[in-house]
Amino acid sequence: MSKLQQFPLSKGWSFRDSEDTSEDAWMPVPVVPSVVHQDLQANSKLKDPYIGFNELEARWVNEKSWTYKTVFQKPAAPAGSCIVLAFDGLDTFAKVKLDGNVILENDNMFLARRVDVTKALEAEGDHVLEIDFDCAFLRAKELRKQDPKHNWASFNGDPSRLSVRKAQYHWGWDWGPVLMTAGIWRDVRLEVYSARVADLWTEVQLASDHQSAQVTAFAEVESVHSGSHRACFTLSLHGQEIAREEIGVTENGTAKATFDVKEPSLWWPHGYGDATLYEVSVSLRKEQEELHKVSKKFGIRTAEVVQRPDKHGKSFFFRVNGVDIFCGGSCWIPADNLLPSITAERYRKWIELMVHGRQVMIRVWGGGIYEDNSFYDACDELGVLVWQDFMFGCGNYPTWPNLLESIRKESVYNVRRLRHHPSIVIWVGNNEDYQVQEQAGLTYNYEDKDPESWLKTDFPARYIYEKLLPEVVQEFSPSTFYHPGSPWGDGKTTSDPTVGDMHQWNVWHGTQEKYQIFDTLGGRFNSEFGMEAFPHMSTIDYFVENEADKYPQSHVLDFHNKADGHERRIATYLVENLRTATDLETHIYLTQVVQAETMMFGYRGWRRQWGDERHCGGALLWQLNDCWPTISWAIVDYFLRPKPAFYAVARVLNPIAVGVRREHHDWSVTHAQPPKTSKFELWVASSRQQEVQGTVELRFLSVNTGLEVRERIVHENVSIVPNGTTNLIVDGLIDHRVHSEPHVLAARIWVDGQLVARDVDWPQPFKYLDLSDRGLEIKKISESEDEQTLLISTQKPVKCLVFEEREGVRISDSAMDIVPGDDQRVTIKGLKPGDAPLKYKFLGQ
């Protein structure tokens, strides 16, 4: 008997170009996990591919094969134990050799692999571990050539990527570079044990009244020799053991224990309650000796997707612990192209930003990776719901038998690895593969329910999404909802707004509609939509080295924007709405204003629709983050610097939010003639679970003078509908013949005497307004060691006051509209006495 021991193989590696067999070709690897681009940079063989045009200088790496090698000593292995070589992730085509003998061949980046090397390590002393990483870029092309009959329809990247189980964005996307990584991208170690807990998971049954829960813990045990093992299960809350049970392990290597929990503390998404985590542990014992112990945290909660017929079609929204949740949030792409560089701390900072921005759901997009455990741990601990795609994106995937088997193993492994996370509330089969099917005219008959027949069509990938994956989820995580694709809705056209989820790209892409009408373009759940914006100047300074290149249309800036047609799209939305500028800093700011306004118009309207029989169940913007310093749809850039849209979304997602808007007048199709009258509406959206009383004020303030142009409207003792929308004015009228000067509609709401939310509706477009000479005043009214409070006032309405984003500094609010008679406070944390004040900018400055 021996207690499980782990020996990390993170040091002592070297690598070389596989074709260069000379002894001096070997270069040191600083640490594993790593990928080849990191190791080449560490050896000064590659420049930072994120700077300038260096991505092009790194392209040679994409077509190379690489060999990694280390030498280790055989670990001490007591009698009756085994030695296992464990890889948590190999990227991607890897032939593993131990002392010259092939012990493993890998072709799937998303799989962990384990090899029993007990016999291979019988000899004492040094052993050589060598891994040949074949070129995935070239292998993919070979695989594609082998199946010329398959329709390789796809968006983004080389279509051959569909043949390889590797992160699809490595082939390049419309927001990221082409960097074909290879290497030991997750941990590698030796394990010595006589028996181990191979898996630990729970199944939770929560009573409908939430007063009790039944927690069943399961353990799967592997042992070298048969014998009587016992499993001691413990259940803990906040570090305190609350239950314990010891049970024998069955002959087939399983054990389970059931715990009854009275008055359980539930897991809630943030804003709805505490994200309480219980911990289950199992200690594997033999003759009272502990051989292995494993612990996992989980939550007691229910989660479902509610799909029911209604007046709008068929609903699609999330319900957690019986409470309907409007899921405002973002889509997530991998946070780096060089994946091992993402630390647990960096993951947590991203999720903390989600909470700071009042976003309740993050969608792990299907062209990236099944994320690191630390990502999901942060979501669990901070109360962020996870929409989890399987890793299929924008293509018609082949279904060769060996590929299907690899996909099955991949999906089983990752569903089992992640099933204990209470944050994961949905598994989704793919990203936009059904859109590829539609656009390529591939065969799809929803009424055909014979999976074997799907494999014979020109859209065989349907078998993956409607047969293979749902069976895996049902077997290994039966309480988690499965959705065949995103977007998808009952086999109907993916753009159908009455059912399922939809990706609404007719702002920016498609018909390039006005962002002011975004809310009219949505569906039952809007899981993608977006608008590009430049990152802050400090980020551009990182990747643009030459000062002469710092102008809006420079070659290097265009190179760092991978979206097709971005020039004309950015220009269109700028010219339609704003007074354009040629200096880079102002251009950056103007693109950010457009993005912030776009997100505000979408979220504000869709959240209002939540109150109309759950017409809109949620909105996940594209995208939260970047994988390199770039110009993209991200609302927070690669360096975790929020763009103005981040703050605009946070305000709309306030637990109680007031909204005001006048009807859209499309100036661009009416010869810019102003309307004679305009209708306006006023409402309150609330995610509170109880009715509250509030006072709502609406003022009409001149843009030119800051004075009120008509009598304000005040609604006192308003009963705010819980978890819904309270419409206060639906037929308001502005007569522009009487009130001819441009004016804003400024709304505020007080609850229990506290001002809780604001909204300001502006005349559109901004380019017709003179926004200079605002009389803005910003005063520092308090200061401590690392916190300042600013008081902001103005004589005339100010649009989109944006503060500088500085490393280590967090701002409570930015991208703000300031109106006379409504001073606002902003708290700045991380700015120390003596530090230079944050710069700021507003529209028209």
From Swiss-Prot:
Please indicate if the UniProt record lists Signal as a keyword. Answer: no
Domain of life per record:
Eukaryota
GO MF: beta-mannosidase activity
- What this chain does, per the record? Exoglycosidase that cleaves the single beta-linked mannose residue from the non-reducing end of beta-mannosidic oligosaccharides of various complexity and length. Prefers mannobiose over mannotriose and has no activity against polymeric mannan. Is also severely restricted by galactosyl substitutions at the +1 subsite.
Instruction: Report residue spans for region: Disordered.
Output: 1-20
Instruction: Provide the catalytic activity annotation.
Output: Hydrolysis of terminal, non-reducing beta-D-mannose residues in beta-D-mannosides
**Any miscellaneous information on file?**
In contrast to clade A beta-mannosidases, which are likely secreted, clade B proteins appear to be intracellular.
Q: What is this protein called?
A: Beta-mannosidase B
Top EC group: hydrolase
Its family remark reads: Belongs to the glycosyl hydrolase 2 family. Beta-mannosidase B subfamily.
Q: Which InterPro entries match?
A: Beta-gal/glucu_dom_sf, Beta-mannosidase-like_N2, Beta-mannosidase_GH2, Galactose-bd-like_sf, Glyco_hydro_2_Ig-like, Glycoside_hydrolase_SF, Ig-like_fold, Mannosidase_ig
Q: What is its EC number?
A: 3.2.1.25
| Species of origin | Neosartorya fischeri (strain ATCC 1020 / DSM 3700 / CBS 544.65 / FGSC A1164 / JCM 1740 / NRRL 181 / WB 181) (Aspergillus fischerianus)
Kindly list any coiled-coil regions of this protein. Answer: none
Give an example GO biological process. polysaccharide catabolic process
Query: What Pfam families has UniProt attached to this entry?
Result: Glyco_hydro_2, Glyco_hydro_2_N2, Mannosidase_ig
Q: Which UniProt keywords apply?
A: Carbohydrate metabolism, Glycoprotein, Glycosidase, Hydrolase, Polysaccharide degradation
Signal sequence extent: none
Catalytic residues identified in the record: 432
Q: Which residues are glycosylated?
A: 252, 717, 723
